Amino acid sequence: MNVRLLKNMNMRLTGIYNYSDGFRENVSQNIMDSNKREEAFSRMKLSYNPNNRLSILATRIYAELKNGYDAWAPDNNTDFKTFSKDKGEDSQRTFGYSLRANFEARENLNITSISSFTETDLVHAYDGDWADSAYYSKIHGWNYTNLGEDYYPIYSVHRNEKNRANLTQEVRMSAGPIILGGYYKHLKEQDIAFDNNGWLIGGATDGNSHYNFQATAGYAQYGVDLTPSLKLKANFRYEKNSIIYDGSSIGLNDYLEKIFLAPISFDIDHAMIGYRTSLHYLKDKFTSFYGSVSQGYKSGGVNQQPFLSDASRPYEPEFIRNFEIGLKRAAHKYRTQFSAFYSQRNNQQVSVSSQQDKENPNSFLFYTGNAGSGTIQGFEWENTLNVSSNLNMDASLGYLTTWVDKFTYFAAEGVEAIGGDREAAMSPKMTGSVGFNYENESGIFASALMSFKDEYYFSDSHDQQSEPYSLLSLTLGKSFRKTTATIWIRNAMDERYTTRGFYFGLIPPDYPDQLWKSYGDPRQIGVTIDYTF
């Protein structure tokens, strides 16, 4: 909704609310919304233009997510039935503010300032063994209560609460083809994790940590027309990060008595350089070619798991050098673009898993490490064809090959394992889609989209893979003067496809390692009505 407040002041309000029951039936709790998604978002923008040289934009956002978390089952069933005895939670509340000011000091000289602040509270909680004692007794003949009253509560609900405050400030100046700027970020995060009766992560019952991250960066960009058809653009960025981490936790000894674990502190500094140089050639008004060489980076950090060794806690920045070429063409009947790329990853970051205690599912944890070098290469193609004045066809194809060099990590306390020497995790080799869009003069429209994703490794620390799958989405609707009504179907073929996969021991009494799957949403049918006023 747009509202004019004063002569030079306008306000825009946006609000969104989404609800879904999460497509899970919890048999143990006899409820249908244990995995619900209830999300509300609002945004207010206030623009003020006192004169032709100064513009100010203030923004306020509010987001509240009251989501459940119940996505896993100890039988890996595809019927979306779960057996957890405790309610999971994946909630978030965020307040955010930003102020952007642009001042035209003189012709071809602009100064821009962007300030922002956000504060977020997050809660993540889940049932540690994913089921109640009745399930394990009936399905596996295993009854925790036979082991004594102190044993079963060990695998109770895990809960992690975070408070995150983030302040950023950016100032940049543009003078013709030159841009100079500076950037500052200060992130503070406090984590409180606890378990009602027992093991938390790797054997801790309570954890408390403070994470203080500061980033300071300067950047520059220069663009020049070498010829009327050939343009050169180059940019450079230098960034320095400072990380201070303090963590404390309480664990259990052999007699299940709480003991204080040794506190952990880190004070780390990292410096990183990024750059990009590109050439853009305009062949004619329909066709252009480009090529670029660039280096990007990903900041380092500290793992907060209390039972990791000191050597495994910090991880270094990753640097990636990219080479890319491509073309774009926009003709009357079609639009197409193609790009091919090759990337070298140095000191690459990988997410590995570790189960500190074979007989404790809550001791399964993820942490980030560095894996030496690796490569990424492939191509992407997108095309839109105007079949007729009412019908067009969209198609896309992606091909990706990756490689991670061999690396070592700790799979359990004192147990070193080897990973890598294969493709990277979460990197399907082939992806693609084909879609049709129809709309006539009377406002009737329809679309069909079929997408495909190839198999991929779930993690860098085990060799379990997903299955390839295809999804079909359909829409049918009609537009009126101010109203649009749409009937839609997502995952029309009701495909069961996995989105995440973990590999660890969960089932007593022997706790063999198994692949545990989480599935994407089933078929959904709905109606959407849009009204413009």
Regions found by a protein language model. Name each.
Residues M1-S20, R24-N67, R93-L99, A165, ...:
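Transmembrane beta-barrel wall of Gram-negative outer-membrane proteins
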Residues Y17-D21, Y62-K66, F117-D121, Y184-K188, ...:
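Transmembrane beta-strands of outer-membrane beta-barrel pores
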Residues E25-D33, D70-K85, D127-V157, F194-D206, ...:
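Solvent-exposed loop segments that connect transmembrane elements
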Residues S47-R53, I61, M173-A175, Y183-K185, ...:
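Structural signature of Gram-negative outer-membrane beta-barrels, strongest in the C-terminal barrel
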Residues S55-F95, L122-H124, H158-K162, L187-W199, ...:
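Flexible loop and strand-edge segments within Gram-negative outer membrane beta-barrel domains
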Residues D225-L232, K240, Y342-Q344, Y367-D460, ...:
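Gram-negative outer-membrane beta-barrel transporters
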Residues N346, S451-S459, K478-F533:
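C-terminal beta-signal and adjacent terminal beta-strands/loops
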